[in-house]
């Protein structure tokens, strides 16, 4: 039950916000872009992808011609059957990549989702551990007189604010990953069309690499949450004989430090992946 003490309530509310954001992250990472927010964003992105496909196909021809001009010294090179066949195969593959780009991206997404679910199940918890206020801390706070509790109010206000801000920063990173996935999906045909020409194909390659990096960010975020849950599963050790303010300050300090570690890891997930994949 909720305590009727304002200080305890404030701390418990902040922790509740944190816990709800953590479980929301857990939920978001197992959600596919088609299910996110009822799928309305996804359907718009698919429509945009379809419209951009026309531009992609026009660019495909352009990159193909540029590629032919750049790679063939003269027209006689193009007339060689093996050279012509190579060019034709490249064009056909590039056309296929644009037409079935969405399916390709979803297949990659499914592979990474599988990895994320495997990480979750092998870690052995379906949801991250809840952070709660220790009972002895509640007792200490509730036994304070009016004047003793004035500095406590200040401490909990600062602590509560910190915890709330950290939980929002963390959830924003996860939403940011989703929005990146949508943007990649919508604009995919343009970078994919560069596969038509040999000089321009690096753009397409780096597009696919960056897309995989965005997908794998999810796995890093899950790992960060798992490590945090295990790291913070033992509540901060507080000296029960110390003054109430000191106890609360020590508790909040250690808690916020643990949370900062997690938020830092979540925010750096894209950098970690880029370093891992050498992007």
Q: Each predicted region: which residue ranges?
A:
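Alpha-helical transmembrane segments
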Residues: 192-209, 241, 272-276
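Alpha-helical transmembrane segments and their helix-start/interface "positive-inside/aromatic belt" motifs
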Residues: 3-11, 81-101, 204-214, 269
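Alpha-helical membrane-interface segments at transmembrane helix boundaries
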Residues: 45-53, 85-89, 176, 205-208, ...
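Non-cytosolic segments of integral membrane proteins
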Residues: 94-187, 225-278
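Hydrophobic alpha-helical transmembrane segments
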Residues: 54-66, 158, 162-164, 181
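Binding/recognition "hotspot" determinant
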Residues: 1-59
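Short amphipathic alpha-helical coupling elements at transmembrane boundaries
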Residues: 24-27, 83-90, 110, 117, ...
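Hydrophobic transmembrane alpha-helix segments characteristic of membrane transport
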Residues: 59-95, 187-201
């Amino acid at each position: 039950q909720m305590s009727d003490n304002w200080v305890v309530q404030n701390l418990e509310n902040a922790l509740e916000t944190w816990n709800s954001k953590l479980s929301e992250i857990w939920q978001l990472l197992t959600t596919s872009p088609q299910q996110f927010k009822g799928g309305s964003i996804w359907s718009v992105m698919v429509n945009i992808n379809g419209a951009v496909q026309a531009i992609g196909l026009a660019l495909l021809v352009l990159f193909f011609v540029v590629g032919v001009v750049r790679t063939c010294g003269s027209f006689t090179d193009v007339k060689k059957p093996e050279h012509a066949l190579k060019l034709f195969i490249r064009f056909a593959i590039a056309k296929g990549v644009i037409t079935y780009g969405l399916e390709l991206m979803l297949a990659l997404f499914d592979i990474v989702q599988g990895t994320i679910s495997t990480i979750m199940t092998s870690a052995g918890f379906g949801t991250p551990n809840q952070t709660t206020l220790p009972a002895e801390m509640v007792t200490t706070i509730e036994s304070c007189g009016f004047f003793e509790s004035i500095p406590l109010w200040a401490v909990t206000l600062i602590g509560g604010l910190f915890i709330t801000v950290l939980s929002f920063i963390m959830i924003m990173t996860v939403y940011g990953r989703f929005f990146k996935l949508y943007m990649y999906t919508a604009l995919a045909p343009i970078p994919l069309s560069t596969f038509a020409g040999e000089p321009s194909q690096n753009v397409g390659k780096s597009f696919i690499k960056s897309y995989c990096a965005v997908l794998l960010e999810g796995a890093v975020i899950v790992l960060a949450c798992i490590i945090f849950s295990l790291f913070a599963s033992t509540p901060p050790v507080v000296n029960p004989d110390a003054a109430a303010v000191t106890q609360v300050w020590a508790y909040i300090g250690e808690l916020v430090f643990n949370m900062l570690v997690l938020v830092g890891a979540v925010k750096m997930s894209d950098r970690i992946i880029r370093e891992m994949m050498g992007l």
